[in-house]
Structure formats: structure tokens, C-alpha cells
Amino acid sequence: MSVLAHVLSADVEVSPLRPVTGPERPEGHQAAVLEHARSTASGLAIRVMMPGEGDDAVAHGVRDLVARVDPAVEADLLLDLGAVRADRPDAAKESLRALDALMPLMPWRTAAVLGGGFPDVTARLLEHGTAVEPRWDWLAWRELTSSTREFVRRLEYGDYGIDSTRGIARGPSSGKGGPPWGVLRYTTDESFVLMNVLTRGDDRAAAIRAVAWEILALPDFRGATAGVGEAWLRDCARGEGPRGTGNAAIWLRAGNVQHMTYVARSLQP
């Protein structure tokens, strides 16, 4: 605890970030974050993990943690749904039930619902070259925000980006080994579009550019001026030779940039 508390205290003057804790974190972590928030008046966030139907143990842990927050401290609520895909058709209803219990616990500064709907990228998913998967997380958000509950208008949206929860947990690739294929990604209103590309071989560059052209030809492509991600796809499609065709890290970055840009615009009133 003392090490974490020291790091937090040293960082408070140079960073606007708030420390995050939650009912599943060790007691020492919780205590350090609570003390930091009290002594610096910088606030904190409480992250509640809900990868499925909520349970009484989690609710009890949140209540205990909230009871230890200094009354003068501002707190943010992060309801983290984890992976939201086809096997969770009731994710919005689960969220509402959880929020019914969480929102009255204290006067939260902000409240956000987080989740990720991007599928696990596998050879089987891409065996036909292209896969189109529903944005289950976005569909759940739409259902959630259609509720007439008073607190819904205060909710903010949190997005895992255009990688699966497992992919995020694995971290970035070392660039060594791996399959002979990668993926270009694009986000439409209700779907994720994934297209298989080669990572090696004499035809690699030409094949990648051809796939980039396919994305540009999608009816839902927003145009090269929509953002940096779209501009990269255009430049990739129009280029020549291997330069500018990217690699796994660049494809993921371009995918995340176009996705987050589109999501941010979609959330504007």
C-alpha cells in the first residue's frame, strides 16, 4: 500500500487522471486509493465488473467500498460489462438492474457503462475472407438509453475499441511468428467488418491494397475525409509496392482510430 500511495501522491500534480479501484481489488489497493482521494481532493473512480448477471457478493462489496469513501470526495462510477456479444442478449437489462442498485449509493460525479463487442479474431471467423459481426455492445447501449429511468440521461458511454476483450488482455504482439494472415477492420452503424489480409509472401502488398479497396467500396464507408483511419485506408489502397501497407500494429491502430472517431460522432446530440 505504501508504494502505491507514494506513486499516486507523486503523480497528482502532473496528471489529471483519477485512480480507479473496485470491490474485487485487494484491501491494500482500495485503502491507498481512498487515502489518496481524501488527501488530495482529486477524486476517484469505482469500477464494478459485471461480465454477466450481477450477484449479491459484488453488490455487497460495492456498498462496503462506497461507505469508506470520504463524504467530501467526488467519485465516478464505471460499470464494466466486459465482453458483450451474442451470448448476452440481456446485457442492457442486466445493466439497468445493476444501475438500479448502484446509482442510489452515493451522488456520483459521473456514471459510465463500459463494454466491448468486437469478436475474437480467429482463422475460423475469417475462413471466407470477410466477416460481418453485429456491434452487440452498441446495440445494448441503444437499448439501455431507451429506458425511461431518470438516471439514464446522466450515463456516459465507454468503449473497449476495435479489439476483443481477450485480444486486449493479451497485449500487443511481439511481431515474431504468428499466423500468415492479419485483419483490416471497419466499423459501420450496427456491424464490425473484418477482412483477412496476408502477412507474408510475394503477393502480400498487392493483396493488402486490394482488401483496402474493398473497404473503400463498402456502402457504409464514410469517405477518406471522415478521419485519420479512413485516410490511411485510402492511402493504402492507392499506394504501390510494400511501403504503406502496414503490419498488425498499424492495422489495429487504424481500426481503433476510425472506430473511436465514429463512436464519438455517433454520441453527439
What are the residue ranges of the model-derived segments?
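Hydrophobic beta-strand segments of well-ordered beta-sheets in folded domains
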Residues: 15-19, 42-48, 72-82, 107-115
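Ligand-binding grooves and catalytic loops that recognize ribose/phosphate and carbohydrate rings
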Residues: 54-83, 89-93
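Alpha-helix capping and helix-coil boundary motifs
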Residues: 1, 53-54, 71, 87-88, ...
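C-terminal accessory extensions appended to soluble enzyme cores
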Residues: 92-103, 107-269
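Short, conserved loop/helix-junction motifs that constitute active-site signature segments
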Residues: 38, 69-71, 104-106
